[in-house]
């Protein structure tokens, strides 16, 4: 029939427009929030527009995995709430158009959003995470975060730089307290930071002294012309040279989980995380594409429940549903890490629970006439 087809295009257009609006707003909020964390390092290394653009591109790609489903929920809630506020849904029902005709365009759009989310989750987002480490490694190699006149902590090492000239550092002081019983203090007139092909970070110091506190009665001083000092940058870059679950390509991750969980082969030291982390990450990527479908099914009956204040109502419900969904994933993930749940149960239980809630709300909305 021509009427349902026209109606479908109308509903789809409304949802798509609000989704694009939500995607712009939510992406900007998430991007600025995460970019602020890296801004100190960016400015400390010497601001460059190429660095900012690289961070924006990589962070934007990573955050899109969550921004897209939440934006679709936002679009469904606002579009349906606006239709309800303008009494358009009542008019549709008076013309004999049921819930099925209204839901079909939303389901169709949710499948498109799910396909995009799946592509992001399987390989695009992990690749962006790997690139983010490369961006930070590049910043660190130029002395990222070592702002003259300020102390910066790298693990158990406190670093102070008196001045900077290009990529070179002047007046470097290091306090290494990785061994509290034998602290080490290093003074150097100059130095540079370098990242090798394997991602190891080395601070090349020139013309300085090493002060070793061997005993409570005696201090040892060693002078040097050049001294290479390896920094522990695990907090900034993660475990160097080891495979992290969140950064692995999907095929490698699946093979790792099969080898560990199915065949029982233990992980060697080349892997940064525990076996449960790799299994949780695998099921996180597999479950991610279901979020837009669930949000679409939830958004329709929720949006039809109220007619006034559609925009504020939709924004509040969007935040609440998204928080509940992703919060439940985090909660069950913590239970799995403690050994109380298996990884598949921890990842798929929220999906099953929200699916049951969505179908119950749809059935109730259909029964009570919206």
Predicted features by range, described:
Residues 196-201, 206-280:
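Mechanotransmission and gating elements of multispan inner-membrane complexes involved in transport
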Residues 50, 54, 109-224:
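Non-transmembrane, extracytosolic/lumenal segments of membrane-associated proteins
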Residues 10, 14, 18, 101-110, ...:
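Start (N-cap) of specific transmembrane helices in multi-pass transporter permeases
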Residues 93-98, 339:
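Short helix-to-coil transition segments within interhelical loops
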Residues 25, 60-79:
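Long, hydrophobic alpha-helical segments
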Residues 1-58:
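Hydrophobic alpha-helical transmembrane segments
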Residues 43, 273-363:
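Transmembrane alpha-helical segments that form the functional core of multipass membrane systems
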Residues 76-90, 95:
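Transmembrane helix boundary and interhelical loop/hinge segments in multi-pass membrane proteins
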């Amino acid at each position: 029939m021509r009427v349902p087809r026209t109606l479908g295009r109308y509903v789809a257009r409304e949802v798509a427009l609000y989704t694009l609006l939500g995607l712009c707003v939510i992406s900007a909020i998430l991007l600025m929030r995460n970019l602020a964390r890296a801004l100190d390092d960016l400015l400390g290394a010497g601001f460059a527009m190429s660095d900012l653009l690289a961070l924006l591109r990589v962070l934007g790609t990573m955050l899109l995995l969550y921004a897209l489903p939440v934006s679709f929920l936002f679009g469904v809630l606002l579009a349906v709430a606006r239709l309800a506020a303008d009494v358009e849904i009542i008019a549709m029902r008076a013309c004999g158009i049921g819930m099925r005709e209204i839901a079909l365009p939303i389901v169709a759009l949710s499948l498109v959003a799910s396909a995009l989310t799946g592509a992001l989750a399987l390989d695009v987002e992990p690749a962006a995470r790997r690139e983010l480490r490369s961006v930070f490694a590049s910043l660190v190699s130029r002395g990222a975060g070592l702002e003259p006149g300020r102390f910066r902590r790298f693990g158990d090492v406190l670093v102070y730089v008196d001045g900077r000239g290009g990529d070179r550092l002047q007046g470097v002081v290091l306090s290494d307290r990785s061994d509290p019983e034998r602290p080490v203090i290093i003074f150097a007139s100059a130095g540079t930071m370098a990242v090798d092909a394997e991602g190891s970070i080395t601070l090349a110091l020139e013309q300085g002294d090493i002060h070793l506190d061997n005993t409570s009665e005696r201090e040892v001083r060693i002078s040097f012309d050049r001294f290479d000092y390896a920094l522990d940058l695990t907090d900034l870059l993660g475990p160097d040279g080891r495979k992290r679950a969140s950064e692995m390509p999907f095929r490698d991750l699946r093979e790792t989980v099969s080898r560990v969980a199915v065949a029982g082969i233990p992980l060697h030291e080349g892997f940064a995380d525990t076996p449960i982390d790799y299994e949780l990450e695998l099921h996180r990527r597999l479950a991610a594409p279901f979020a837009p479908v669930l949000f679409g099914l939830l958004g329709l009956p929720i949006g039809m429940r109220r007619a006034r204040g559609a925009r504020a109502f939709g924004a509040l419900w969007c935040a609440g549903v998204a928080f509940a969904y992703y919060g439940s994933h985090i909660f069950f993930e913590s239970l799995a890490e403690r050994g109380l749940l298996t990884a598949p149960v921890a990842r798929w239980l929220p999906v099953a629970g929200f699916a049951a809630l969505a179908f119950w709300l749809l059935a109730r909305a259909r029964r009570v006439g919206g």
